[in-house]
């Protein structure tokens, strides 16, 4: 179980995340939503251990993650929003490197890498440099690297970015399958339709603070709104989206 308790992050006096508290449980897919600048990415970086909170605590299975950060990271798989990869390596070389850095046993890891490359339709390009890969192919490499060590906690930051329709459907089903097998899955995305299809529980962030933390079904009932998009718009969108779209259309036609 992943627990955030009163987590706050300040940069030079500016509060990026303010008193965030929520729980992501095994077997459950938790959606973490918010507009740009709301603090989602900062929260994800704190959960991965890349940065430390200014206040509050993050626990996994009851233990503060900073107590044994290396051990915690061995149990975590992370797909970041931006695919920063070693472009001079091939997809196969990159995954071998990830396995070695994690001290995974060579033979079973090689078999697992081969299987992941085949199932993600990368096997034919496994010897090509990542610099020649499309964005979707790079995303598949990141997904493979995040799952290579069979992590207990899976953090996904815009994981569908760049994926073709078929791979997107596979990933959607895979996320559900991993949760069903007892993984803790935290899923951050701007694609509310996918979140609504995949997640049972959502946390919505606005102006660095949580404005909703509930099941999607209960939020629908509570707010008397039929879709997650409408719920999100009411809680976290301050702009007149229709009015702005009309102004843009008027401007380009003037």
For the regions a language model picked out, list residue spans one by one.
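Conserved ABC ATPase "signature" region
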Residues: 96, 100, 107-125
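Conserved ABC transporter NBD signature motif
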Residues: 56-67, 71-72
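Catalytic Walker B motif of ABC-type/P-loop ATPase nucleotide-binding domains
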Residues: 154-157
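Helical segment within the ABC ATPase nucleotide-binding domain
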Residues: 169-181
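ABC ATPase "signature
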Residues: 213-214
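A short, surface-exposed alpha-helical micro-motif characterized by mixed small hydrophobic
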Residues: 195-196
